[in-house]
């Protein structure tokens, strides 16, 4: 009997566990179904958004008792992650609030919590979308207009804070302004005087804020034909135009208007008091930007008109397109399809809007959000999906860019070159070059012939020399790159008269016999007895080794021995240039390899770039490509050491706290301590700190070298021009000052650490104002 009872008990326990698992499984299925329904609401083409919402409200209302928290979480996530469907979800919340007032209050509290957490964690876009969602709930009679205005007033209070960066004040003002298109009409009808008071406070702030950063972020230095407006100025002009139109915009879908009879009967909730978190130095706010304009209505053919630059519809369309790119940029085909599937696409010249927004992303200053090739690949997919119209719009855009290239920012010039060469390589290098032949009459340093020359150099990397020669008209012969071949002087006809030839031939013979690095070192040890000078010996040694990938790897020890001093490293770089002067790509990859193998230091590369020998190459793109990859190598090294030190300190701290907790715990609750192998010793941490400190010193030295050389050559040019009575604003000067600005902006996060040092040592008040202004604009970006 007892045995049977035990068996029955086991069966009952098994049945209980099985039923529990079944319930959990069923609940999970229901939760997944609810999430799918909420995410896809409004996307069915077979029925209207309104009928979708009615059906979903019925489903959710029935499940609120069991899945309340799940529904709250999904809806708040949708508000942040799918801002393009903001009004659909606010309508859904409004209908649920009309049926279940308690749930409406819980959702408002949940959304307020999301907004506050986003601000605290510096998730700026999420915070802005949360604020927009809360504002749109006013339209759905979920939140009272009075409490929203109180919140907006509290946010605008940030603009009156003292001793905080302007970028903080700017962001909070931008968050409020970008919310008004959704709720402005309702506030205008219900609380006009309070709304006007809010706008007046914003206007006062905008009129007094500094815009020193503006010129540093412009794509073009000229405002013809389209002004390059600062983002807050542009949005303020759009809001003022919207106010003149009585807050009536034509772009935002408002499904809640259909349900107005239901929603207006619902009770409203008041927002709690929300105070923005205070500023502290570790917070990084979004940087300002300039609104990019390429087209206006005159550029578009017959059909829908392009909204004006100061219409709020232009802002809403562009913001939506930017968000599509942000969401789908990892998959170019999906991204292109989503862009072409833009809502209301029949009401606007969509192709023009898309092309303008993509170039706005590509030319965004100080750096684009994604790699250049990301935008190029999306444009290629767009041309494939829309072959009848998009290639023509893109060609028109390219023509506009080329005609305005004279005043284009140097960084944007580089990106334009990279994009256009990549685009040509995907379309058989076909282009109507004859239409640009007027540039052949201009000076070689002028941006137009310089652009074509740099494009052909990039095309050469993506093709081969004969192909480039065949694709270009004969009139462009002077802009076509020379054949990229090595110039090894010890095999030339004059080699017999060159010092070092004997040593060079001896080394070449040994290398052909597959000698070891040690044998090469022994040969080099005999050089002093040959009677050559140090420089001659170095030239012979480095040229004989014919620096290439295999040579660098196999004879790494030899190179390290030869490159013990910075002078020797610069000598190596001189010889690389002498050997590969006609092969820019080889120069870039070889120097990159030398840096990786730590044969040359970053400071040596910077010094070499500004040497007199490189004067003829100074305005060529590849030289600055080398400088930037050098700076990036240094930056990555510092970041790596900093991360490793932080991790080690964290492990050490956790190990200490774990040890103390273990001592206090009872034997039954004792935690597993961190093992000795996992815990770094204090000596190891100290050594890591020393390494990081040394790396920071080297990084600072690198930036000091670069900026000091810029100041020297620019000051010399300005002084010489003043002495000779010539206009200093030459093509060379514009390229050089543009490269100085490019270094500041491309590496702004790292340079910012040393801004006070730079101001004290280099960018002093007695410096020429043209050079000093570049530094002041850079500092203003984070001011």
From Swiss-Prot:
Gene3D superfamilies: 1.25.40.180. GO terms for biological process: 7-methylguanosine mRNA capping; mRNA export from nucleus; negative regulation of viral genome replication; nuclear-transcribed mRNA catabolic process, nonsense-mediated decay; primary miRNA processing; regulatory ncRNA-mediated post-transcriptional gene silencing; RNA splicing; siRNA processing. Residues 31-243 form the MIF4G domain. Keywords: mRNA capping, mRNA processing, mRNA splicing, Nucleus, Phosphoprotein, RNA-mediated gene silencing. It is found in: Nucleus. GO terms for molecular function: mRNA binding; RNA cap binding. InterPro entries: ARM-type_fold, CBP80, MIF4G-like_typ-1, MIF4G-like_typ-2, MIF4G-like_typ-3. Residues 1-25, 652-683 are annotated as: Disordered. The keyword Nucleotidyltransferase does not apply. The modification Phosphothreonine is found at residue 9. Transmembrane segments: none annotated. GO terms for cellular component: nuclear cap binding complex; nucleus; postsynaptic cytosol; presynaptic cytosol. PANTHER family: CAP BINDING PROTEIN (PTHR12412), NUCLEAR CAP-BINDING PROTEIN SUBUNIT 1 (PTHR12412:SF2). Component of the cap-binding complex (CBC), which binds cotranscriptionally to the 5'-cap of pre-mRNAs and is involved in various processes such as pre-mRNA splicing and RNA-mediated gene silencing (RNAi). The CBC complex is involved in miRNA-mediated RNA interference via its interaction with Ars2 and is required for primary microRNAs (miRNAs) processing. Also involved in innate immunity via the short interfering RNAs (siRNAs) processing machinery by restricting the viral RNA production. Component of the nuclear cap-binding complex (CBC), a heterodimer composed of Cbp80 and Cbp20 that interacts with m7GpppG-capped RNA. Belongs to the NCBP1 family. This is Nuclear cap-binding protein subunit 1.
